[in-house]
């Protein structure tokens, strides 16, 4: 009855006033309406429409393969090259990232691990955020891990300022950090800032999707982490699982600009080729599970609730899919 009422109301109002869901998006006009897109001029709009049609074609051709649903999202009007540059600016230094890693695997003293583990069911994680047109995934991942620790260990629900990390670890502002604002950055550098200075809450230093000069005098309580540790490069699944269970959600760097992950909707993403050169996106692992014999990781992204399943995605576990096991970092309070 409720569905019929909504349908009737939509039929009575002007055409186009009822927004389709992301799965129902079939035209560029629908895409603009759902995601509130406004372009600078006709030339840009034509270019964005071309990219949208390419992504829509890809989604329609791949939907349902291996039981995975793909969907249009906010980034569907970007070219593949633009999207990849948007994530990392093409500026991640893998030599530096590997230098931060532990040299040895964890000592295997953790015994058996549960088949399913999900921090969303054990603590109140903060809302899914949207990094928008700024390549600040590294800041969102680090802040999100710290927020999770405060929820898990102190039962405090706080939303920390990613913008402070973007601005105040910008190496042109403070050369002791290796970050480039919206261009690229490292969650390990963000943790260093949280150790030294701490972060204020989002409401005190709001996010605005651009790099600006740091405001060190912003008022508000500061929240710190006491340390961080990056696991050995290409850690085993068991080491990563144990770390999540013992220390809370972890930051990982992965290949995020491929169309499979970019357009992920529902289902477990499987069998995507990967190499180090494509590492370009930081996200959070909040747990793992198994469904119909397929082992998977639970990923918390920073692309809004329109991506994946309400902002979370599921990627096959057991094959270092998308490089998930390569760069794994946890923090401590």
UniProtKB/Swiss-Prot annotation:
SUPFAM superfamilies: Cysteine proteinases. Glycans are attached at residue 93. One of its GO terms (biological process) is proteolysis. Residues 19-108 form a propeptide. SMART domains: Inhibitor_I29 (SM00848), Pept_C1 (SM00645). The keyword Repeat does not apply. Its EC number is 3.4.22.-. Keywords: Allergen, Disulfide bond, Glycoprotein, Hydrolase, Protease, Signal, Thiol protease, Zymogen. Pfam families: Inhibitor_I29 (PF08246), Peptidase_C1 (PF00112). InterPro entries: Papain-like_cys_pep_sf (IPR038765), Pept_asp_AS (IPR025661), Pept_cys_AS (IPR000169), Peptidase_C1A (IPR013128), Peptidase_C1A_C (IPR000668), Peptidase_C1A_papain-like (IPR039417), Prot_inhib_I29 (IPR013201). It is an enzyme of class 3 (hydrolase). Disulfide bonds join 134-182, 168-214. PROSITE patterns: THIOL_PROTEASE_ASN, THIOL_PROTEASE_CYS. Residues 1-18 form the signal peptide. The active site is at 137, 281, 301. Transmembrane segments: none annotated. GO terms for molecular function: cysteine-type peptidase activity. It comes from the Eukaryota. Homodimer. Belongs to the peptidase C1 family. Cysteine protease. This is Cysteine protease. The lineage of its organism: Eukaryota, Metazoa, Ecdysozoa, Arthropoda, Chelicerata.
């Amino acid at each position: 009855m409720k569905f019929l009422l909504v349908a009737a109301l939509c039929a009575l109002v002007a055409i186009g006033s009822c927004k389709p869901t992301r799965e129902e998006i079939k035209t560029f006009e629908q895409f603009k309406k759902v995601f509130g897109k406004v372009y600078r001029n006709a030339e840009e709009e034509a270019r964005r429409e071309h990219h949208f049609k390419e992504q829509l074609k890809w989604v329609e051709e791949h939907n349902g393969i291996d039981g995975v649903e793909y969907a249009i999202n906010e980034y569907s009007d970007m070219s593949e090259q633009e999207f990849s540059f948007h994530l990392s600016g093409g500026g991640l230094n893998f030599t530096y990232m590997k230098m931060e890693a532990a040299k040895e695997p964890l000592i295997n003293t953790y015994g058996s691990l549960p088949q399913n583990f999900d921090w969303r069911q054990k603590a109140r994680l903060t809302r899914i955020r949207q990094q928008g047109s700024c390549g600040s995934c590294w800041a969102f991942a680090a802040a999100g891990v710290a927020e999770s620790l405060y929820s898990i260990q102190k039962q405090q629900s706080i939303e920390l300022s990613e913008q402070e990390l973007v601005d105040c670890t910008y190496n042109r502002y403070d050369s002791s950090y290796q970050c480039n604002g919206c261009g690229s950055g490292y969650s390990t550098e963000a943790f260093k800032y949280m150790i030294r200075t701490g972060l204020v809450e989002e409401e005190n230093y709001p996010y605005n999707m651009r790099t600006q000069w740091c405001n060190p005098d912003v008022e508000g309580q500061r929240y710190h982490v006491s340390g961080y540790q990056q696991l050995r490069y290409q850690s085993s699944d068991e080491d990563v699982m144990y770390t999540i269970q013992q220390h809370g959600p972890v930051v990982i760097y992965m290949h995020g600009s491929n169309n499979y992950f970019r357009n992920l909707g529902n289902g477990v993403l499987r069998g995507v080729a990967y190499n180090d050169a494509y590492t370009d996106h930081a996200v959070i692992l909040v747990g793992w599970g198994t469904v119909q014999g397929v082992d998977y990781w639970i990923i918390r992204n920073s692309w809004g609730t329109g991506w994946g399943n309400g902002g979370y995605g599921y990627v096959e576990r057991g094959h270092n899919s998308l490089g998930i096991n390569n760069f794994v970092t946890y923090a401590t309070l």
